[in-house]
Amino acid sequence: MANLKYYDVILKPIVTEKSMNSMSEKKYSFSVHPEATKTQVKEAVEKMFAGTKVASVNTMNLEGKNRRRGNTSGKTSKTKKAIVQLTADSAEIEIFTGL
């Protein structure tokens, strides 16, 4: 298990059409550190965004995509994605409002 601080766990929010539609169910998508656990993601969200209470966390490891540039082929880096479900009485996350 990685020794990560809560501000190192969440890298950036994922803003796609699918993630925006799931916000009505209080589900938010984040790109997280590859070694972060579900408990670390839960603690990071509750500490970084005041008034939020996490009900559940779903994580998935995404493989890198194959890319070519001329005759050279390679792969993009692997990433980890977390979908955080907030409780009904929880406050909304401010960075997603107004999008």
UniProtKB/Swiss-Prot annotation:
GO cellular component terms, alphabetically, are: ribonucleoprotein complex; ribosome
Any one Pfam family match given in the protein's UniProt record, by short name: Ribosomal_L23
The answer on whether this UniProt entry bears the keyword rRNA-binding reads yes
Keyword tags: Ribonucleoprotein, Ribosomal protein, RNA-binding, rRNA-binding
Q: Name one GO molecular function term.
A: structural constituent of ribosome
Q: What GO terms describe the biological role, i.e. biological process, of this protein?
A: translation
Assembly behavior: Part of the 50S ribosomal subunit. Contacts protein L29, and trigger factor when it is bound to the ribosome.
Functional summary from the UniProt entry: One of the early assembly proteins it binds 23S rRNA. One of the proteins that surrounds the polypeptide exit tunnel on the outside of the ribosome. Forms the main docking site for trigger factor binding to the ribosome.
Which family does the UniProt entry place this protein in? Belongs to the universal ribosomal protein uL23 family.
Q: What is this protein called?
A: Large ribosomal subunit protein uL23
Gene field: rplW
